[in-house]
Design a protein with these regions (language model features):
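Catalytic pocket-lining loop regions of alpha/beta-barrel enzymes
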Residues: 201-343
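Acidic-and-aromatic substrate-binding clefts and catalytic sites of carbohydrate-active enzymes
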Residues: 88-94, 117-128, 152-155, 161-168, ...
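Sec/Tat signal peptide C-region and signal peptidase I cleavage site
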Residues: 18-23
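Hydrophobic faces of well-ordered beta-strands that scaffold small-molecule active sites
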Residues: 35-39, 111-113, 143-146, 186-188, ...
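Mid-to-C-terminal alpha-helical segments outside catalytic/metal-binding sites
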Residues: 25-37, 42, 46-55, 60-110, ...
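Active-site gating/metal-coordination segments in enzymes
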Residues: 25-26, 110, 118-227, 231-234, ...
Length: 393
């Protein structure tokens, strides 16, 4: 063998070995490492306590882009919120420590943390910047989601008929700021958020709102998904009695969400929209046949599943039985669309030094127990691979 042939042989062998390393890395990035795409940190609210009091005392200068009617509505809501209990200070990085411990218990490698959907002046409201210390502390584990404290209030406070160029420009500027901050998803946004207790919040804005359309365009442009909280309602209906009893904020009737939601999905097919809390149904229409119909019709729709504790076993359209095994009708749906389902436990992780002390994470526990009961291939896809692709992790 000539020296030249020996050299070629050595180089070829090296490339084969290197290729094997690359292949092994690509196989192991998500092996055993799941992803939760929807988590919150309890205790962040305290960071805003002093600032919130100042903001609540501001007038229309707080949001100069808003039309007069919207500012008046916001002022009325501000007065209501001022009467509600303020949240004591807490430490969100301590809650992040607790979240990491929760994740380690189930082999969850990464979690997306984001503010819940908010309205301006709500007690406990906070911006995405309050999460940056936690994300910085765990850069390989915690991923930033943003918009619930900035974009969602703009949508909720602006009547669709009052949207103008000034509002559109302000919304776009804030969305671009969020993208540049490193966020991997716009969230948590809401089209219909029912109030579940006196300290909860009712929020509703049609999914075909001009600002939702703009958000879809921006999501497509910057290649990041939208995280959406919404009840499934095909036609206008009276509010269920249990919701009226749970919270006085819920109106006597609820407007249909699904027709407008489909218009949002059709508006920009390049916008990935992840419908959160599938398995947490407060109306009764979030059924497997409906999900199948929508997934088949809209290729840019994705679902994030959430399990519920046994104490809430009467909840409608759960995805699992009392042993946290996926029900046959839901398993059939998952097997039909294995690349369109992710996991979002929707838990508020709370450390011991945060208001109220340590909080047992029931939704996180039961959601990931349910994932563990999936068939292996489906578990791998739904538990992590889909999220890595959809959220560009």
């Amino acid at each position: 063998m000539t020296l030249k042939k020996i050299f070629i042989f050595i180089v070829t062998l090296s490339l084969i070995n290197l290729k094997g390393v690359w292949a092994e890395e690509s196989k192991t990035v998500w092996a055993g490492g799941f992803v939760d795409v929807h988590m919150h940190l309890d205790g962040v609210q305290g960071k805003m306590t002093g600032q919130r009091q100042t903001n609540l005392q501001k007038k229309s200068s707080e949001a100069p882009w808003m039309p007069p009617k919207a500012r008046k509505r916001m002022a009325m809501q501000r007065q209501t919120m001022m009467r509600q209990q303020q949240t004591p200070a807490g430490d969100n990085t301590a809650s992040a420590d607790h979240l990491i411990a929760m994740m380690d218990q189930y082999g969850v490698r990464k979690a997306i943390v984001m503010p819940p959907p908010q309205t301006r002046g709500r007690p406990g409201a906070y911006p995405y910047t309050a999460l940056l210390d936690s994300v910085k502390k765990y850069p390989e584990r915690l991923i930033l989601g943003a918009g619930g404290g900035e974009l969602n209030p703009m949508i909720q406070e602006t009547n669709a008929s009052e949207v103008n160029e000034k509002i559109l420009d302000a919304f776009k500027a804030k969305a671009v700021e969020i993208v540049r901050s490193g966020a991997h998803v716009f969230g948590e946004m809401t089209a219909l958020h029912t109030c579940m207790n006196p300290k909860h919040l009712y929020e509703a804005s049609p999914p075909d709102h001009p600002l939702f359309f703009l958000l879809a365009d921006l999501a497509a442009q910057y290649d990041i998904p939208i995280d959406l909280h919404m009840e499934a309602i095909a036609e206008d209906l009276p509010t269920p009695e249990k919701l009226l009893q749970a919270c006085s904020q819920n109106p006597p009737a609820l407007s249909a969400t699904l027709p407008a939601f489909e218009r949002l999905l059709e508006h920009n097919r390049r916008a990935r929209i992840v419908w959160q809390h599938i398995g947490w149904d407060n109306i009764g229409q979030m059924t497997p046949p409906l999900m199948h119909q929508l997934l088949a019709k809209h290729p840019n729709l994705y679902l994030a599943i959430k399990a519920v504790p046994k104490a809430d076993a009467a909840r409608m359209n759960r995805i699992h039985d009392d042993n946290y095994t996926i029900l046959p009708e839901w398993l059939e749906l998952f097997e039909s669309f294995p690349d369109r389902i992710v996991v979002g436990a929707d838990e508020f992780a709370r450390a011991e030094n945060v208001r109220g002390g340590y909080k047992k994470p029931p939704f996180f526990d039961v959601t990931w127990q349910t994932v563990m009961n999936l068939p292996p291939k489906l578990q791998k896809q739904i538990g992590g691979e889909n999220a890595a692709r959809i959220y560009r992790l």
